[in-house]
Regions:
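Catalytic-core helical/loop segments in enzymes performing group transfer/polymerization on anionic/lipid-linked
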Residues: 1-169
Length: 169
């Protein structure tokens, strides 16, 4: 499985990953089997040096803007920034490629982005919903949901070329 920091660009362009996840117990996104990563985190047996190293890595990733694919050059729309400044609740809904193994393994009820965005809106109808389709869908390398165009009726904003870090800030 691709690691949490993959590459500069998408795997569909045959750009090799710079990190991979190997786990003999299971994979982190499959709730049916506890992965080695989950066991390590659950045990919480970390030294002060481990925690300090993790904080330094996190700070460096945030400071340098590193993301999984390191793509997205546009800024958030000004109108969305104004909404954020006004204190209105904003929920980011990151899309997924619908034939991805994580969807099949982890989601019993939500099987596509339309169902995901709809469920989020139903849970919090007053929030501003920002939908970010998966980069492979945006690039045309993976098929969009059959209901992809219907998401427009539910989401308030759709951001495609914005860096994920800017969406989370």
């Amino acid at each position: 499985e691709d690691g949490f920091i993959r590459s500069v660009g998408l795997g569909k362009y045959y750009i090799p990953p710079i990190s991979l996840v190997f786990d003999n117990a299971g994979i982190y996104y499959d709730p049916a089997t506890e992965s080695e990563l989950e066991k390590i985190i659950s045990a919480g047996d970390f030294s002060d040096d481990d925690l300090q190293l993790a904080r330094r890595l996190q700070d460096r990733l945030l400071k340098t803007g590193v993301t999984k694919y390191n793509i997205g050059q546009q800024s958030l729309p000004k109108s969305l920034l104004d909404i954020k400044e006004a204190g209105k609740k904003i929920i980011l809904v990151p899309g997924q490629v619908e034939d991805d193994a994580s969807i099949a393994a982890a989601c019993e009820e939500v099987k596509d982005d339309f169902a995901l965005v709809k469920a989020v809106k139903e849970r919090d109808s007053e929030a501003i919903i920002v939908y970010k389709p998966h980069p492979d869908v945006v690039s045309g390398h993976s098929p969009a949901s059959a209901h992809y165009d219907s998401i427009v009726a539910i989401d308030d904003y759709r951001v495609t070329e914005v860096n994920i870090n800017d969406c989370l800030a």
